[in-house]
Design a protein with these regions (language model features):
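Hydrophobic and amphipathic membrane-targeting/association helices
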Residues: 1-183
Length: 183
């Protein structure tokens, strides 16, 4: 009895002081159209599929391939380097890094003292790419959930979880838009 009471108090205390986690989710149906060979070709080149080996067009639009596209470095990099809004110069990567206290950690390092993603993409160095790759790897493991709620249907769910509601919502929206424009 006493043990249950202590566990209940600890659980309540944990829930009260824990930062909330916000989830932004987009769920949609993958459409397979006819005569979209140009779209098929661009999608195929990214996920490494040889169109000559595919006899059925629907195999290319299998949601498993699209799940991998959502998790690809290229799509996530484009999303992270997007701006928070049209009139705001801050990139999503900067907001994410500030929220995770990564900016402070980077600026403590002498090599990264003046490091910023708020520069033109053409001026970004290998260091930017390396840091972005590390951030993306962690993000995919901890905060990005791409799933098929039902294996029999062509439905896809994209979720972004973060303690910053605005970041979660914006990143989810931007990622879905980028991938949908791509294919």
């Amino acid at each position: 009895m006493l043990g249950s009471l202590v566990i209940a108090i600890l659980r309540i205390t944990y829930e009260v002081f824990r930062d909330p986690i916000y989830t932004a989710e987009t769920t949609f149906i993958i459409e397979v159209g006819e005569g979209d060979m140009s779209q098929l070709g661009s999608l195929a080149s990214v996920v490494g599929i040889n169109l000559n080996n595919i006899s059925d067009e629907s195999q290319l639009f299998d949601t498993d391939h699209i799940v991998e596209l959502y998790k690809s470095y290229r799509m996530l990099k484009l999303a992270f380097l997007s701006r928070l809004s049209d009139d705001d110069s801050e990139r999503l990567i900067t907001r994410f890094a500030r929220g995770k206290k990564l900016l402070k950690r980077w600026h403590r390092d002498d090599e990264l003292k003046n490091f910023s993603f708020e520069i033109p993409e053409a001026d970004m160095s290998v260091k930017h790419d390396s840091i972005l790759m590390e951030v993306i790897d962690d993000f995919k493991k901890e905060q990005l959930i791409i799933a098929k709620p039902n294996r029999k249907l062509m439905i896809l769910s994209v979720k972004v979880e973060d303690d910053d509601a605005l970041f979660a919502e914006k990143f989810n929206t931007v990622l879905v838009k980028i991938v949908n424009q791509f294919y």
